[in-house]
Amino acid sequence: MCRIVGAPRTLLPLLAALLQASVDASGEISLCKTGFPEDVYSAVLSRDVLEGQPLLNVKFSNCNGKRKVQYESSEPADFKVDEDGMVYAVRSFPLSSEHSKFLIYAQDKETQEKWQVAVKLSLKPALPEDSVKESREIEEIVFPRQVTKHNGYLQRQKRDWVIPPINLPENSRGPFPQELVRIRSDRDKNLSLRYSVTGPGADQPPTGIFIINPISGQLSVTKPLDRELIARFHLRAHAVDINGNQVENPIDIVINVIDMNDNRPEFLHQVWNGTVPEGSKPGTYVMTVTAIDADDPNALNGMLRYRILSQAPSTPSPNMFTINNETGDIITVAAGLDREKVQQYTLIIQATDMEGNPTYGLSNTATAVITVTDVNDNPPEFTAMTFYGEVPENRVDVIVANLTVTDKDQPHTPAWNAIYRISGGDPAGRFAIQTDPNSNDGLVTVVKPIDFETNRMYVLTVAAENQVPLAKGIQHPPQSTATVSVTVIDVNENPYFAPNPKIIRQEEGLHAGTVLTTFTAQDPDRYMQQNIRYTKLSDPANWLKIDSVNGQITTIAVLDRESPNVKANIYNATFLASDNGIPPMSGTGTLQIYLLDINDNAPQVLPQEAEICETPDPNSINITALDYDIDPNAGPFAFDLPLSPVTIKRNWTITRLNGDFAQLNLKIKFLEAGIYEVPIIITDSGNPPKSNISILRVKVCQCDSNGDCTDVDRIVGAGLGTGAIIAILLCIIILLILVLMFVVWMKRRDKERQAKQLLIDPEDDVRDNILKYDEEGGGEEDQDYDLSQLQQPDTVEPDAIKPVGIRRLDERPIHAEPQYPVRSAAPHPGDIGDFINEGLKAADNDPTAPPYDSLLVFDYEGSGSTAGSLSSLNSSSSGGEQDYDYLNDWGPRFKKLADMYGGGDD
């Protein structure tokens, strides 16, 4: 059997816990038996038990491997067992006879079958110092052997054990490296092994604190340790062969750093501030001071004690305060705290570790400043019994008197701040008292207007007290009282209208000169004989006037409810009343005229413009009516179309949807695109009703499948790009050029045709019939032609030009021609023959005149007609006389022409 030891030179020997399983003397393997393989587990400890310390490992034989057991301790307050059978200490306690024995239970979770085993702990007695030194050379930690399984049976080897932690004091002086323990494996007899340690302090930061001899397994520390930096090191020891193959499972080595008293207590603050009310009873809590120690708080090195070293001043007693030596709470221990005598105390506080041991403990000091706070032990007192003030009537927010008090308490504290109140003489609440925060004076202020004619003087009773009540035991009364006499000064007051505003109800449409009402003001100055005059101050529509003496209001224009100056049927006018006092005063009054509606506005169509498609389906326009009147003079409305012109009802139809809306639709299947003005008759429901023909501008346009207009304006408005617009404009310009070229070509062709027609013999130019143009029923009833229009043919107005349409070949073109010499006017409108002869002479002598005057050619309308065609008028130079007798055969419509040219004598 191997003995496990290990400890630094400065500590008592550390004996490792040793567990040994019993084996048969013959070394044969016994049959598997469910339960604990040992009757008693023993562990030998080198020191008292620490909280969380692993003690030993108990094993439960589970032959079939299917049982799931749960471990319990008979002393759960002291020991606990993990699922793997490791036993730990629940708390720290000195190992004694009552803690040396306990039981461990294992219970099957399914069958509830239960087993138990006893555990015995013993403390190895301390060895003499010489023995320790000798034993150090052989103290070693041996890698444990594991229980192996062979053919379903357990073969017992070395029993598992737990290595107790190694304790090292901090701040050790060496020499370094300082040997701690030797780690070895029992396989070193047959194999060449190499040892190593890993973990923080070895190969992890902070590295190099612990080293191990790879050959001998000797573990050493290389420098002093500091518990305040690292209180525990957790290392793992490894054993491998020369090829680096793991020979043993790693074992855990815990090194605890033992605390030394190397840190003084430190106060959280060097100066502590606290307060205590004056007159406090003994035992009153004041404040708490706190110090901390970096040493182990569970050891004497970190256990602090407090005490008061000094008190200044020492009146009325040198021991006015005491401190709890463990918690640092400062309380009063004597009566007599008086702020008026001592306002502040200064205490020197000391904190000492080692539970306050003055010989071995380290100490530090701090200052505690305790301020004695004031309490209300002095009430405020008025400096006079009566205060005086005066105020003009109708003035508010003015100070009429200052109330002064004295208070012996600390200024600007609740015990010094005064609160004033009026206890009598002001039932209507016309006065108020505010406290000046700087001087503590009471400011008597008027908060409601005071009327001299009602009351000429006020006598107020006021009281003053502090914000907080007086302290108990004070014999003074809690408040002080005084009297305030306020005199009211008479002033000229404003006249006032009553009621204001004044509301009257009138129908709109009243004619000018109608008396509406009388609006007068009253003068509150009853003791003054004053006259009041009235003027108009505001009349937005200039509808009213007021009599300056009696206040009678009369209309000067027609009242209109629909005026923009009328809001919510109410018209507001403001009037001014002025007296002749010194100084003169004035007041305003508002007259509100509620105008009753009459049916004086005809309805109008809304909207005034709309769009519709060329085809009726789907096509409709929803319209409504706008009537500035209100119910019952507005809706419901009646919608209809007028009878004239007939195209309205022929093209359109209107359907009434309800009292406010109607629908306008196309009646025909197709209407050419354009702008149409559709008159709509709208009638309201007034009594009597009022009608109006309102024009709705309808834009008829081509539509897409969705019923939306597709005209160019809409397309451009829809956001066409600049390039698209330029392309469209170019296309339009090209089209216009083509049209112009076509027109030029047509005119040139007309000239060629006219030239050919001039060569036709007049005798052969016989028309078979005469076509009628613009026949609109009946013949020309007015035969009295105005021949005066022939006097100046070249001054005919452009409106007389025949519109573009079917034109005769021999008709003069409409476009501009060169300006020819002006021919003389005929001497008389009736002498048409002389006029024509003079015109022919002028044409013959004019080299620039076109040949239109030589021969007039009319459109050829066929041959073989019994009636001859109209002949042209020949000039005198053309040769021969023209025979107009055939005009008599053309019927009554040409009678005038036959009379003019048929007479040979004329």
UniProtKB/Swiss-Prot annotation:
Signal peptide stretch: 1-25
Alphabetic keyword roster: Calcium, Cell adhesion, Cell junction, Cell membrane, Cleavage on pair of basic residues, Glycoprotein, Membrane, Metal-binding, Phosphoprotein, Repeat, Signal, Transmembrane, Transmembrane helix
GO biological process terms held by the UniProt record: adherens junction organization; calcium-dependent cell-cell adhesion via plasma membrane cell adhesion molecules; cell migration; cell morphogenesis; cell-cell adhesion; cell-cell adhesion mediated by cadherin; cell-cell junction assembly; glial cell differentiation
Residues binding Ca(2+) 2, per UniProt: 170, 228, 259-260, 262, 295
Alphabetized SMART domains for the sequence: CA, Cadherin_pro
Propeptide boundaries: 26-159
Post-translational modification: Cleaved by MMP24. Ectodomain cleavage leads to the generation of a soluble 90 kDa N-terminal soluble fragment and a 45 kDa membrane-bound C-terminal fragment 1 (CTF1), which is further cleaved by gamma-secretase into a 35 kDa. Cleavage in neural stem cells by MMP24 affects CDH2-mediated anchorage of neural stem cells to ependymocytes in the adult subependymal zone, leading to modulate neural stem cell quiescence. May be phosphorylated by OBSCN.
SUPFAM superfamilies in the cross-refs: Cadherin-like
Compositionally biased residues, Low complexity: 863-880
UniProt: Ca(2+) 1 binding residues: 170, 226, 228, 262
Spans traversing the lipid bilayer: 725-746
Residues that bind Ca(2+) 3: 261, 263, 293, 301, 353
Molecular function GO terms recorded: beta-catenin binding; cadherin binding; calcium ion binding
Cadherin domain: residues covered: 160-267, 268-392, 393-497, 498-603, 604-714
Tissue spec: Detected in liver, kidney, heart and brain capillaries.
Cytoplasmic side: 747-906
Region (Disordered): 863-884
Residue ranges annotated as Extracellular topological domain: 160-724
Glycosylated residues, chain numbering: 190, 273, 325, 357, 402, 572, 622, 651, 692
One CC-aspect GO term: cell surface
Function: Calcium-dependent cell adhesion protein; preferentially mediates homotypic cell-cell adhesion by dimerization with a CDH2 chain from another cell. Cadherins may thus contribute to the sorting of heterogeneous cell types. Acts as a regulator of neural stem cells quiescence by mediating anchorage of neural stem cells to ependymocytes in the adult subependymal zone: upon cleavage by MMP24, CDH2-mediated anchorage is affected, leading to modulate neural stem cell quiescence.
Oligomeric and partner information: Homodimer (via extracellular region). Can also form heterodimers with other cadherins (via extracellular region). Dimerization occurs in trans, i.e. with a cadherin chain from another cell. Interacts with CDCP1. Interacts with PCDH8; this complex may also include TAOK2. The interaction with PCDH8 may lead to internalization through TAOK2/p38 MAPK pathway. Identified in a complex containing FGFR4, NCAM1, CDH2, PLCG1, FRS2, SRC, SHC1, GAP43 and CTTN. May interact with OBSCN (via protein kinase domain 2). Interacts with FBXO45.
Record remark: domains: Three calcium ions are usually bound at the interface of each cadherin domain and rigidify the connections, imparting a strong curvature to the full-length ectodomain. Calcium-binding sites are occupied sequentially in the order of site 3, then site 2 and site 1.
Designated name of the protein: Cadherin-2
Gene behind this protein: CDH2
